[in-house]
Amino acid sequence: MTRPAFATRRRTQLFDAVVALFLAEGFAHLTLDEIAARLRCSKSTLYTLAASKEQLVQAATVHFFRAATDAVEARVDAVAGARERIVEYLAAVGAALDPASDQFMADLDAFAPAREIYERNTRIAAGRVQELIAEGVAAGDFRDVHAAFAADLVAA
């Protein structure tokens, strides 16, 4: 394995571990020293991911949503039929968010940069539901409806 491939894999593993820790316990109460100790790595290793705790939280939040999006879309791609795809999409989104503890969600809401990432991804998810509805209309599976309105109803 080449050095860049190893570095990329190791970086992904570290982000996965940071995300798992944050999802389980939140992040506001953790210091970089505590994060490093919990992950059994050095603080300098964490600094290869981000220059500060705040930037680490932001980067981990982005990493989480990228991985969640990939997992959700893989599940949707495996299903045929407009209704089934929408149901699978919503179930997959729920499954992706299931590991998020109440503390993580509270910390996310309290930290504006991470909250903005969450809100942006929520808007993207609502747009994806609109796309799935529009695909169903185009395929004749649904009546022609205002997709944005229908997506808002589904998301509520």
At which residue positions do the language-model features occur?
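Basic, helix-initiating cap at the start of DNA-binding domains
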Residues: 1-25, 29-38, 54-58
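Helix-turn-helix/winged-helix DNA-binding modules
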Residues: 24-27, 48, 142
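Short hydrophobic/aromatic patch on the recognition helix
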Residues: 39-50
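Alpha-helical DNA-contacting segments of helix-turn-helix folds
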Residues: 50, 55-64
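Hydrophobic alpha-helical connector segments
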Residues: 59, 70-99, 151-154
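Hydrophobic alpha-helical bundle segments that form small-molecule/ligand-binding pockets
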Residues: 77-80, 122-154
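Short secondary-structure transition hinges
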Residues: 91-131
